Curated annotation (Swiss-Prot):
The gene is rpiA. It catalyses: aldehydo-D-ribose 5-phosphate = D-ribulose 5-phosphate. InterPro entries: NagB/RpiA_transferase-like (IPR037171), Ribose5P_isomerase_typA_subgr (IPR020672), Ribose5P_isomerase_type_A (IPR004788). This is Ribose-5-phosphate isomerase A. Its EC number is 5.3.1.6. It comes from Treponema pallidum (strain Nichols). Pathway: Carbohydrate degradation; pentose phosphate pathway; D-ribose 5-phosphate from D-ribulose 5-phosphate (non-oxidative stage): step 1/1. SUPFAM superfamilies: D-ribose-5-phosphate isomerase (RpiA), lid domain, NagB/RpiA/CoA transferase-like. The keyword Calcium does not apply.
Amino acid sequence: MHERNTTTNTPLDVTAQKLLVAQRSVDTLVQEGVLHAHMSIGLGTGSTAMPAVKRIADHLARGTLSDIAAVPTSFQTALICERYNIPLFSLSSKRIGGKLDVTIDGADEIDTQNFVIKGGGAALLQEKIAAYNSAHFVIIVDETKVVETLGTRAALPIEVVPEARMSVMRTLQDWGLSVHIREAVRKKGPVVTDHGNFILDARWQSLPTRTPQDMERALNALPGVIENGLFTERTVRVFVAHADGSVEERSASF
């Protein structure tokens, strides 16, 4: 299904698109009953996921949602949930039992097959654990994240144990990718994930010869790779905000 609705005469910037798609997607899921009381919800990380968390908090305050159990995918998300008094659980807690009803998250890129690159916020491991253990996976993005081929604009993040950084980098270079260790912004040295690992950012120097599914599996087979930012193993429901104020749905309803 490709459905768009509501337009505006004033083009929306990217920040406004992120807010629009976060609010519209959560409202739609609540109206359809996809989001409802007593659910377990995985909450993503990043600049589009955060306003979705806020919208869920709005529904809790109104009473249109109640008694939900939220599983955050990063410390950033956990802090936002605490601010809005959203009940927090771990995926392994007794109430959750390792399985989520739905996960809502943003993306760095999404292609025409609804395959996704995530991990710009270095939370790809927790994000994938949540997404791949959810009955439903919802991606919300602004229109700049939509590409024909993954890797067009965003780097592919790969989480590695520190000891494996050089061996994995060498293998990726042999595969024809350019790769570097992601450097931290407000401290010296590399980004360290919530799990104590490093992030390698890889880019294709030419069109990839492997399919996204094959690349996801091949990367995870390398010794020392914990996880990578390709999400290809789940059916995804996608909401895309556009500058004209419309929100497009790019996959079938649940």
